Design a protein with these regions (language model features):
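Nucleotide/phosphate-binding catalytic cleft detector across ATP-hydrolyzing
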Residues: 1-30, 34-149, 167-212, 216-268
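Amphipathic beta-strand/beta-sheet edge segments enriched in Tyr/Trp
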Residues: 160-163
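C-terminal edge-of-domain segments
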Residues: 151-157
Length: 268
């Protein structure tokens, strides 16, 4: 039986009525896929895998590698499965789908996402850089006067970004080739810490971020947070429910057309 979870979102993310009806927020990660529609009240959380590949290969097929589409046919099947589940929430057909993509997503990567969504849902996909959505989901003021510093650590990718004026102004990315049942192996932590420290050193002198917020499954690893604090010498904290920060942010952007317009200015 498929590992599918429904996790209720925090009420504050659902207080305001949808600005536009019929949306689906979609966060397809290397290991997990999260989605939520305008007619639902919970996040659907399932493995980023499908069974019964066309080549007859036994076992699950994982369409993504390091956060980007590696198997377009399998990715299409996964998106179809996730989006068709939205029919049960009464949000079908959606007017639009807001989907997260990595900072390093190429035009081909973005096209693969858009093609799959258009074929299944019959509407255009609006693409948002995943760390930007995660910052919104973590409660950061991405349009405030002070830049934000965020590190998103997923199963196949770590992305450290600087957000200023509602857009990502600088970023560093590290592909993660190995994870364990409890997250990153200890030897991989140094690479993530060094990457984030290098990004912080590139920032102008003033104004400085108030600290670093960590999202993604890696935010649950205490050794990572401890090493970041020691190396960066700034406040470091994990977002609430860090694995769901991106999908929360995507939903919030769907409810805030003004903020969405700024966040997606370079992501369509």
């Amino acid at each position: 039986m498929a590992d599918v979870r429904s996790i209720h979102t925090h009420p504050r993310h659902l207080e305001q009525p949808p600005a536009r009806r019929g949306f689906v927020a979609l966060d397809v990660g290397t290991a997990r896929t999260r989605s939520m529609s305008s007619g639902g009240c919970a996040v659907a959380d399932r493995p980023s895998a499908i069974t019964g590949g066309p080549s007859g290969v036994p076992g699950p097929v994982r369409p993504l590698r390091h956060g980007v589409v590696a198997d377009p046919a399998a990715y299409l099947r996964l998106v179809r499965l996730v989006l068709l589940e939205a029919r049960w929430s009464g949000a079908w057909p959606p007017e639009r789908v807001l989907a997260g993509v990595p900072v390093t997503a190429t035009p081909d990567d973005r096209r693969a996402v858009g093609t799959a969504v258009a074929e299944v849902a019959g509407c255009e996909a609006t693409l948002v850089e995943g760390p930007l959505a995660a910052a919104v989901g973590a409660g950061l003021d991405i349009a405030g006067p002070r830049p934000c510093l965020l590190l998103d650590v997923g199963a196949g990718l770590a992305e450290a970004v600087v957000i200023d004026g509602g857009v990502i102004t600088d970023a560093a990315v590290l592909q993660l080739s190995a994870t364990t049942g409890t997250g990153l192996p200890l030897y991989a932590l140094d690479g993530v810490v060094g990457m984030t420290a290098g990004l912080l050193r590139r920032l102008p002198g003033r104004p400085r971020p108030a600290g670093l917020v960590v999202t993604g499954g890696g935010a649950r690893q205490a050794p990572l947070l401890e090493r970041l604090r020691a190396a960066l010498r700034v406040p470091v904290g994990a977002a609430p429910e860090p694995g769901h920060a991106t999908i929360r942010g995507l939903v919030s952007l769907c409810l805030r057309p003004d903020l969405e317009a700024r966040a997606t200015a370079g992501g369509r």
